Each structure stands twice: as C-alpha cells, then as structure tokens.
C-alpha cells in the first residue's frame, strides 16, 4: 500500500488545477449566448437640430456571442441566461469568425443608415429611401460564387424575377433544391451581367441550397439633415430599432413620455422590424438595469 504523502497530494492538486484551468479556457466547438447590459443610445446619436429627451431614454440590448469553453459546454448553467448553439447555427456556411465579425460591422453600419432614414420619414421629413436589391457582404471560400460574385455586388434578379431585398433572395433560394442551377442578374458598378451557378448543400442539420454569399438589403438613401450614429465596436443589425426611436425622440420630444425603454430589432426600409434573436438574453440584460423591455414580435415604425 502506497502512502499518500503531502508531496503527492500537492502534485495531484496541481494536476487537477491545471485540468480545471484548461477546461475553463480552451474553447469548445460550440458557441455561447450571454446577456449583455443595456446601453444608452443618446450618447451615440446626434441629429442636426435635434435635442436629447429631458426625461426617459432609449437603450439597446445586445447578446454576447463567443466560443464556449469546454467547461461551459459541460455545465451550461454556469452563467445566468446562457444558451449553447452549434457553429452551424451562428456562422453562415463557409464563413469563419473573422469574416463573421466583418459582416456584423457592415450590418451595423447598414442598420444605422436605415434607422436614420425611417425615423426622419416617421417625423414627416422628406426622405429618399429605396430598396434596390441585395448587396453581397461576403463570398464564402470554396463555394460556387467564388470567382463569379464579389463583395459590394448587388443582386437585382434571380431567374429573371426582380430582387429588391435580402428577403427576396432567401425566398428565391428556398424554392430551389440542392444541385439546381440558378441564374443571378448582378450589378457591379455601372455594369450589369448574369451569372449561372449550380447550388450546393449548406450542410448542418437542415441542409438547403446555397451558392455561398452573405447578403443584406441594398438601399438608396438621401437624408434632408445630418444624422450621426456611432456604436463603437458593436456589430450586427439589431440595434436599428433603438437608433430609429432615438432619432425620432430627438425630433419629437413626446415620443418616450418620460419612460426608459430597451429596444431591439433589425429595422427594414419599409419600417418593419425583423424577428428578434436572443430574446431571453436581451430581456435579462434589460431587467438587470431595471429598464422596461420593448421588443416587438412583429412591428413597424
């Protein structure tokens, strides 16, 4: 029988500590969604001729998304309000984390432009705001669109049917089976051309036909006054509704009625609010700061 000496106990403790540390820092193959705090919007938005509301305020709520550590994957209850998702539910097919970050920042910039235009229109200002197609944000490596389509190209038709928004692309692609050949009419600068591509599988639990592009709605926007929005390093389009409400509140003082509200949701050029993701995390983030969540299931500004 071997004696358990202090030295052996110390060595065993060091090994267990090293294992625990490794489990805590080594990323797994899944992503974790965590609540984030509510962010005041007023310091981020400046409207020419506008004024911040004296009472109340608008806040946007975000979701912290990162690779889950092995420990977080094994014990999902380590963080309040956390959810785990496979990579296929977070990254578009063929898109890596660096590309996804770039897409998120582009989506944020786009959402700011649309939010300003929608809000000014709601305030009765003359605004030019038109959806003119689906702009390509990213082309995924190794998929059919490589060498044929490029970032900033605008898809204006699919199989001859006009495309005015990203949702038109999703609808058109959903009607095709994996392996179908699809015709894309594309505008690149002043040139318009047609590319035909055979679709491939997206993979994952719900495989569908793709060609390997990430798109957003292309818009033509002209505003009658200057609006500046600076979200720092926050990405994604879901702060659009909060930005729009803030712009409107700076021009129309009675919008908030003195309340503090947390708003989230991607806003479309027609004023519609897209379905909201991460509702659980965003609700927790708002309630932690004692701010009333104002998340429309379906809405329009």
Regions inferred by a protein language model and the residue ranges of each:
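Membrane-entry signal-anchor segments at the cytosolic-membrane interface
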Residues: 1-14, 102-106
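PDZ-domain C-terminal substructure recognizer with occasional recognition of PDZ-binding tails
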Residues: 170-214
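Terminal peptide-recognition signature
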Residues: 120, 145, 152-155, 184, ...
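Glycine- and Gly-Pro-enriched alpha-helical subdomains that act as flexible
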Residues: 241, 245, 249-255, 261, ...
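Hydrophobic membrane-insertion alpha-helices, especially the h-region
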Residues: 8-27
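PDZ/PDZ-like peptide-tail recognition elements
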Residues: 32-53, 59-65, 87-140, 196-254, ...
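Conserved PDZ fold ligand-binding element
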Residues: 145-168, 282-283, 290-301
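Short beta-alpha junctions and helix-cap segments that line functional grooves
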Residues: 46-49, 166-173, 183, 195-199, ...
